[in-house]
Curated annotation (Swiss-Prot):
Binding residues for Cu cation A: H142, H152, H161
UniProt feature coiled coil, ranges: none
Gene Ontology MF terms: metal ion binding; monooxygenase activity
Disulfide pattern: C472-C506, C479-C499, C488-C503, C516-C550, C523-C543, C532-C547, C591-C625, C598-C618, C607-C622, C634-C667, C641-C660, C650-C664
Cofactor note: Binds 2 copper ions per subunit.
InterPro entries: Di-copper_centre_dom_sf, ShKT_dom, Tyrosinase/Hemocyanin, Tyrosinase_Cu-bd
Cofactor annotation: Cu(2+)
Leader peptide range in chain numbering: 1-18
Gene this chain is encoded by: tyr-3
Annotated ranges, domain ShKT: 472-506, 516-550, 591-625, 634-667
Top-level taxonomic group: Eukaryota
Keywords: Copper, Disulfide bond, Metal-binding, Monooxygenase, Oxidoreductase, Repeat, Signal
Stated name of the protein: Putative tyrosinase-like protein tyr-3
Amino acid sequence: MIRYIILLVYFLIFEVNSQLDCSKAPTPAIRIMCNQIQRWDQKARATPSLSGDVKTPGIAGKAMAAEFSPIASNVFQCMDIACLCVFFRGTGGNNCVVQGRPLGKVVRKEYRMLSDDERQRLHQAFRTLKQNGEYDRLARVHAQYSESGAAHSGPAFLPWHREFVKRMEFLIRQVDPSLHLPYWDSSLDQNLPDSKDSILWTNEFMGDANGEVNNGPFRSWKTVENKPAITRAVGAQGKGYSEDEINTMLGQTDIAQVLAFSAPQRGCPYQPNFNVPEYTHGNPHIYVGGDMLETSTAANDPIFWMHHSFVDLLWEMYRQSKQTRATRETAYPADNRQCSSEHHFRAAFMRPFTPMRNADGLSNMYTDNLYSYAPRPSCNAGPTCGSPYLFCDKSHGAPRCAVRMKPEGNCASFKNGEDACYQGSCQSGKCVAGSQNVTPPPTIQPTKPVVTVEVFSETCLKIRLKFFQTSCFNENECCGPWSAKGECQKNPVYMNVWCKASCRQCTPNYNINEECSDRHTNCAMWSRSGECNKNPLWMSENCRSSCQKCGRSRAATCGGGGGADSISNPTTMPPATNNGQQNTPCDSPMCYNEDQCCPIWAQRGQCRSNPGYMTCQCKVSCGVCRPNYVYGPCADYHYDCAAWARRGECLKNKWMPENCRRSCNTCVNQQQLAARCATRIVRSAFLELIRMK
């Protein structure tokens, strides 16, 4: 009872603090989306991303970097084809061949641009994943606000879904390596007089439009909630994407209007905006209705994945047209708890996809290495827009592509010879079927999966390959000794993530007590490619034999103790922006940034390139701890700030401008801060040049 009272009080406080008034939404559909976004934000804020400070167990004489190695320990962590090739047991690296079939970078096409063979194989791959349980296990992730806090209601919405969709595409490619996850451009359906007339809602494509889906390739799919079938209510409310919505997104110049604060609270400097991508993406959800209407059930419907593939395409179009290559990987709104939950902070873990962080979803590697997008269908391809399922509409202003209509569709307004009716003709303003009747898709034999799947738990995905590989690894060779000293209980926030195997957060398929062994099938290959030196922490723990680490035990290497805060002789240099000074001891037990430039340094990747300094001096910006104050606004983060400011500490102590913003009068926006920190870089370089002379 007490727990429910606390939650009720929290939600009442949230209502008071929220500056988002859903009653002002421009349409009923956006109002529905607004309420859903607000509910998700409430629940996510009630389940913080970190439950306490992350304190790395110490090693005598060493500064421990609280960061993961870039080695992919399971297939979902892969970011290039060479990595996928290893897990798919193929040959050829980036020119991979798996069981005689090529495995390469894919080009995602619009769903109606697929050939009949491609579409049928895609449907079969979805059915295979449904039958073996992998579809449902991934779909459940989208419903878990406590485990997937960054999925909605803030700036991580687009990066989080990019990774989520990537994982479904990997599952599809495990069934058929030549396939990709197409995108559904709902504007093609919206361009019809009545979008419900689209052939999308027929046996050949998505099946029933209303009620339970009992025909088509996904008929009688039991949902993760154990309902007998997917449900839809196409066109009851909402609509598909419009060109105006797309152009509004592509025309933005402020990243905070793309990676947007969709549920801001009072005090957030960004006002509510119902035109940001998270809101406009909701229209097609509500238009399809049924399971797609609610966040918790949307992923039951396969059209969810194609819709989010299109959302990802729009984001990539923005990235390519408005951002430089470098900016694509760094531009992210400033962390501010008055604007979003901590789950959306730049350096927060992208749960449940740890060890990824939200900023990792900005990586160019997705579209450099894994997939690209075919252009949206265009009338430049001719009267059929390049597909037998589309046509070029010349009767409603500028030529535009639209999807063809099923029998009884309203074709009366097409006056310029368009072939708008699929396998039929327009008679008296209605589509009439011709001599060819639309037939159900042919039955095809299930494709033999490239990999097989074993379930280890209900909450996380583990892939079992033909040569069986686990994803249960420690990230550091000291995890075992730390665990033996009780760190799993003393320091669970760090240990349960970085030392999963030793803290029994998962079940390894190897003998964790062996001192000299290779725990991963790929250890020998990684050793030959230099990973023992590039990624010594992970490799020294999991590839000890291949890295020739057997001559010294883990316990001998990891002698000493204490926490990261007690490290007295760190050797890591600070960022170049820190006036060229050596690192100082990490002696602050509190959760603060020590420098006003920490957010900018974090944006520039210093948390990873220089973790020894950053995880000590920039704890908040690097996601190392959870502050017990509201980080982000123009405020004082310590109750003594005013007194310290009166004593002149604002000019003496670099800690003050960051944490006593109001008392020190150092409130700046992200652009001003970036300029200020850039000046420090120039000054540092100038002083270094003088010293050299």
